[in-house]
């Protein structure tokens, strides 16, 4: 039987987006991220992070810096009894298959974990996240952004707590 997944963008969903975050001291978790993840873990979703990290290609930081921050982030999730199944990242600039809005990272997860994409969820903070989710045939696309964005193929919320309340009300 295929497994459901919750895909999360990193900057703007897991942590406050401060542009090219790669240092632990600059990494600040968004309010509600742990509660949201625990909710979906309790419903047998696998948890994945799919993040564009063009700061690597731009020379702002090294891939080793990204991995150090990932280790810190995963340890913080573990302290909250949350297991992130895998982090997918694109270190490139435009033009590659893995960079969102293309679906490369999401499709790689689908193949590696035999995921049921139609019953999976992707939460992102940019339209490129929503487009990537659409391109990967993910069933539920959620945009978390205080600025209203145009699009009819996703739902939009102002914050993670609103998203969690939405799913609790739907009893998903």
UniProtKB/Swiss-Prot annotation:
Its main location: cytoplasm. One of its GO terms (cellular component) is cytoplasm. Substrate binds at residues 9-11, 17-20, 51-54, 99-100. It catalyses: D-glycero-alpha-D-manno-heptose 1,7-bisphosphate + H2O = D-glycero-alpha-D-manno-heptose 1-phosphate + phosphate. Pathway: Nucleotide-sugar biosynthesis; GDP-D-glycero-alpha-D-manno-heptose biosynthesis; GDP-D-glycero-alpha-D-manno-heptose from D-glycero-alpha-D-manno-heptose 7-phosphate: step 2/3; Capsule biogenesis; capsule polysaccharide biosynthesis; Nucleotide-sugar biosynthesis; ADP-L-glycero-beta-D-manno-heptose biosynthesis; ADP-L-glycero-beta-D-manno-heptose from D-glycero-beta-D-manno-heptose 7-phosphate: step 2/4; Bacterial outer membrane biogenesis; LOS core biosynthesis. The record marks 99 as: Contributes to substrate recognition. The record marks 51, 100 as: Stabilizes the phosphoryl group. GO terms for molecular function: D-glycero-beta-D-manno-heptose 1,7-bisphosphate 7-phosphatase activity; magnesium ion binding; zinc ion binding. InterPro entries: HAD-like_sf, HAD-SF_hydro_IIIA, HAD_sf, Heptose_bisP_phosphatase, Histidinol-phos, PNK3P. Mg(2+) binds at residues 9, 11, 125. Zn(2+) binds at residues 90, 92, 96, 98. It holds the Pfam family PNK3P. This is D-glycero-alpha-D-manno-heptose-1,7-bisphosphate 7-phosphatase.
């Amino acid at each position: 039987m295929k497994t459901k997944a919750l895909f999360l963008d990193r900057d703007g969903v897991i942590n406050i987006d401060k542009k090219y975050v790669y240092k632990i001291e600059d990494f600040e978790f968004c309010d509600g991220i742990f509660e949201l993840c625990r909710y979906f873990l309790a419903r047998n979703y696998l948890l994945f992070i799919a993040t564009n990290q063009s700061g690597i290609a731009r020379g702002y930081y090294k891939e080793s810096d990204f991995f150090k921050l990932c280790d810190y982030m995963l340890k913080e999730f573990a302290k909250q009894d949350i297991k992130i199944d895998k982090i997918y990242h694109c270190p490139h600039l435009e033009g590659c298959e893995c960079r969102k809005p293309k679906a490369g990272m999401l499709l790689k997860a689908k193949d590696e974990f035999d995921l049921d994409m139609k019953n999976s969820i992707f939460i992102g903070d940019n339209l490129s996240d929503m487009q990537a989710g659409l391109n990967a045939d993910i069933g539920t696309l959620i945009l978390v952004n205080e600025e209203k964005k145009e699009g009819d193929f996703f739902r939009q919320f102002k914050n993670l707590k609103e998203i969690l309340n939405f799913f609790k009300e739907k009893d998903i």
